Regions:
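C-terminal catalytic "cap/lid" subdomain
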Residues: 1-320
Length: 320
């Protein structure tokens, strides 16, 4: 088995937490204990690659930079992505190594600060189309003030009701390919557990001469994870989130869980609008892409059900 695991934001920071380093390390230890359970069941020629989100960490870092800009210059979003990749990669790497060592396993683990290619003419870069919320939720007055201070920002209402329903949104371009694919393939081939494409990867565009340049954007981590799955020739794509299964008719009286379905059914349900754009939508879309590429199985489930889901006992299981 060649397995690509995509960790959700709750694997590193819970919604109710402030996001201290201590809190995040605790969450990483919970997460990597489950990953160690997976590794301990793997055969010698099996491979594991891990990717992760960075939404809360990147949002907090952007707030810190905004508050401190009078003393030190704020950094661009590609730099913020690189910084949080290093932060989260370090925490996951250390925690996983510790659990594997306790089990007598000495599989090398490495975290890679990784670039992902996007198109400079992606529609997300133009007009008011930017769709990825970042930073804190704001009141309408706070949103107006932010727009006054930063006329170049796009600030949108992201929830239909409530007091704090406004957020800054940034471009979320479609990932095209993984810039560091050859290095990652070699490490995976050597039996190393690789943590890569964190937070969707650092968004870069090609300058046409073999050079790359970072851009102000945030790539969806599940879609970038699917591109990473292609790079490492994964046969199984496991997306871990905060629910055991995806749902049809979410939030309605006729809501129902999605168990084992085919690729054709997944495409049908997605086209019917069952999966929301800001949550389950990109996950299902990533699963569809993976199976269309040639993957064998895509799974969506919760962290605590990961091993059961890999054994086919729970989760939303999508096959071609």
């Amino acid at each position: 088995m060649r397995l690509l695991v995509a960790l959700g934001g709750n694997a590193i920071k819970q919604a109710h937490e402030k996001g201290t380093s201590e809190e995040q390390f605790v969450n990483c230890r919970v997460t990597t204990k489950h990953l160690a359970d997976i590794v301990s069941r793997m055969k010698e020629d099996d491979r594991l690659v891990i990717t992760h989100g960075n939404g809360p960490q990147a949002g907090n870092l952007m707030v810190q930079q905004d508050l401190g800009k009078s003393a030190v210059p704020a950094q661009s979003m590609d730099i913020v992505g690189a910084m949080t990749q290093g932060q989260i990669g370090y925490m996951l790497q250390q925690s996983l190594i510790n659990f594997l060592t306790d089990r007598g396993l000495h599989t090398p683990v490495v975290a890679v600060v990784n670039q992902v290619l996007v198109k400079e003419d992606d529609p997300e870069f133009f007009g008011e189309t930017a769709s990825k919320p970042v930073g804190n939720f704001l009141t309408e007055e706070e949103a107006k003030q932010l727009k006054l201070e930063h006329p170049e920002y796009i600030v949108k209402k992201v929830k239909p009701t409530g007091d704090r329903v406004w957020r800054r949104t940034v471009a979320s371009p479609d990932p095209i390919s993984n810039v560091d694919r050859e290095a990652i393939k070699r490490m995976v081939g050597a039996g190393i557990i690789v943590i890569a494409s964190g937070g969707g990867g650092i968004p870069v565009v090609s300058e046409g001469n073999g050079h790359y340049r970072g851009v102000e954007a945030v790539i969806d981590k599940d879609l970038a994870g699917e591109r990473l799955a292609e790079v490492v020739d994964a046969d199984t794509f496991l997306i871990l989130t905060d629910v055991e299964k995806a749902k049809l008719n979410f939030g309605k009286p006729n809501e129902e869980e999605v168990g084992k379905i085919t690729l054709a059914q997944a495409k049908k349900y997605s086209a019917e609008g069952h999966f929301l754009a800001g949550s389950m939508g990109p996950k299902v879309r990533a699963c569809i892409r993976f199976l269309e590429w040639g993957g064998k199985k895509a799974i969506i489930t919760s962290l605590d059900k990961a091993v059961e889901a890999l054994n086919g006992k729970t989760g939303t299981q999508i096959t071609a």
